[in-house]
Amino acid sequence: MFRCWGPHWGWVPCAPTPWLLLSLLVCSAPFGLQGEETRQVSMEVISGWPNPQNLLHIRAVGSNSTLHYVWSSLGPPAVVLVATNTTQSVLSVNWSLLLSPDPAGALMVLPKSSIQFSSALVFTRLLEFDSTNASEGAQPPGKPYPPYSLAKFSWNNITNSLDLANLSADFQGRPVDDPTGAFANGSLTFKVQAFSRSGRPAQPPRLLHTADVCQLEVALVGASPRGNHSLFGLEVATLGQGPDCPSVNERNSIDDEYAPAVFQLNQLLWGSSPSGFMQWRPVAFSEEERARESALPCQASTLHSTLASSLPHSPIVQAFFGSQNNFCAFNLTFGAPTGPGYWDQYYLCWSMLLGMGFPPVDIFSPLVLGIMAVALGAPGLMFLGGGLFLLLRHRRYSEYQSIN
């Protein structure tokens, strides 16, 4: 209803009706009145034993709650997210147990009774497809090459990339075993950033964030593809909600000021709000400048249940949740067989938000509100003016008295 499929890669504007504009304006108005919460956010690398380990803890303290995000590249890159109803909750790490074959119980948020929500997200594999003979929108988008297991990557020491001023840190990795030299000049980077207040990043897709979220930016740079038209993707796994998987939905908007020609926002929700959520726009970029010309479509497969034994093992997920868990997985693929692609500059970047509480809701920008006011106001003024004209004309004729 809000988008049309363009000739090259994505969505182009469709003309909405005035009634649609009015309904969207009315529906979005309450969200524009919601308050913004500021949190005291700290970011630290938890010291490992006996050697430094990549365990990043983000603690966001609000007026009566605390959010914990624990990111790690022990095994595949993963994050454990925990929301508590106290400002005093703390993270406890048992390093000797965490680095053991059975790390269950090594990671805790105390007091346990304060935990209101917890889940995890694991980035298990880097996917690559040969899209030479693939059709638009096909799933999978071509013949798959053997995937790269992210549990078999070597990751940098994140202490060297820790930026406390911007509340960010980079996990940068390469395969431990790279017989073809595909990553000789390349790397895969997971950039994590936290926020103490609401706002938008300077670069597209400029997702609206609050103090309740972290942003993850995934960048594949300089790696040699195994084909002339390779498409890349990520396999993502999360904990199921009992026997069921989290829900995935799409939200549409007529406002594309912050992400030109992209009118859709995808959401993964763990249960009903307020709980946890993952948000992203279905767009990636093949150039560092992230102009519209370098935009790539991002497609998500259906979320499905999967066996834990089929996924790379995540020590921090087992450390917090134990070994008996139901997992759900889905794939994200970036690009299409035609148009711009990773092959242009050997660059791919995609962003998402991960948070707890109520997902951020976009309100209409001043520019779009002005356009809507004109679109809705002009017909109304014409109708009002026409009515006044007819009324005055009727009164003029009714006051006329014949001289006879």
UniProtKB/Swiss-Prot annotation:
Pfam (any one): NCU-G1
Ranges in the topological domain labelled Cytoplasmic: 392-404
Glycan-modified residues: 64, 85, 94, 133, 157, 166, 185, 228, 331
Localization per record: Lysosome membrane
Secretion signal span: 1-35
Tissue expression summary: Detected in brain, heart, liver, kidney, lung, intestine, testis and spleen. Expressed at highest levels in kidney cortex. However, another study reports highest expression levels in lung. Expressed in myoblasts with expression increasing during differentiation into myotubes.
Impact upon substituting residue 331 to A: Reduced glycosylation
Result of changing residue 400 to A: Abolishes lysosomal localization and results in mislocalization to the cell surface. Localizes to lysosomes when expressed with wild-type MFSD1
Chain ranges for the short sequence motif Lysosomal targeting motif as given in the UniProt record: 400-404
InterPro entries according to UniProt: NCU-G1
Lumenal side: 36-370
A GO CC annotation given for this chain: nucleus
Impact after mutating residue 85 to A: Reduced glycosylation
Subunit organization: Interacts (via lumenal domain) with lysosomal protein MFSD1; the interaction starts while both proteins are still in the endoplasmic reticulum and is required for stabilization of MFSD1 in lysosomes but has no direct effect on its targeting to lysosomes or transporter activity.
Family classification: Belongs to the GLMP family.
Function as written in the Swiss-Prot or TrEMBL entry: Required to protect lysosomal transporter MFSD1 from lysosomal proteolysis and for MFSD1 lysosomal localization.
Name of the molecule in the record: Glycosylated lysosomal membrane protein
Organism annotation: Mus musculus (Mouse)
